Amino acid sequence: LLFGNGGNGGNGGLLIGNSGDGGAAGNGAGISQNGPASGFGGNGGHAGTTGLIGNGGNGGAGGAGGDVSADFGGVGFGGQGGNGGAGGLLYGNGGAGGNGGAAGSPGSVTAFGGNGGSGGSGGNGGNALIGNAGAGGSAGAGGNGASAGTAGGSGGDGGKGGNGGSVGLIGNGGNGGNGGAGSLFNGAPGFGGPGGSGGASLLGPPGLAGTNGADG
């Protein structure tokens, strides 16, 4: 209760202890025939909380969206990354945000190729009072649009990078996560996702903003 580290996603001790990391998410199931959408990637788990002294855990990664290997089926979007845990109320580092999952891609068997799914966003970095804040997670890439036929699919958009955590007193602000790349295409290109913002710090250097993802 007072001392000790949390397990995955668990809380640290009320006085001293590190919180656990968030669990990684499962991937969406792909399908191999025409029809319904494939599975979406699950969202990564958030880290647990810390007490007075301890480091925040890292957020879990988002799962990848499922692919489709035949026409007219939807595709799974990438899951969101979990948020990093905050550092202790007195001292401790914030955890990093989890990375977003990549999107699935559609089939391209006949003339009407499907569109790529969107990449998952990165989780936000944990905040800190005295200590370094966590970095935001990087976003997942968009899925590729189908390339076959006269009406190729559009590329999926990249996800947004997570924001870096902020520091209330002394320490480095967290860096923002990178935006996901837009996908390849035969129709319209996918747009790259924006990078996350860098975290502020009262008596320390701020974090750097993440880079924007490249367009398809």
Where are these regions (language model features)?
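Collagen triple-helix signature
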Residues: F3-G216
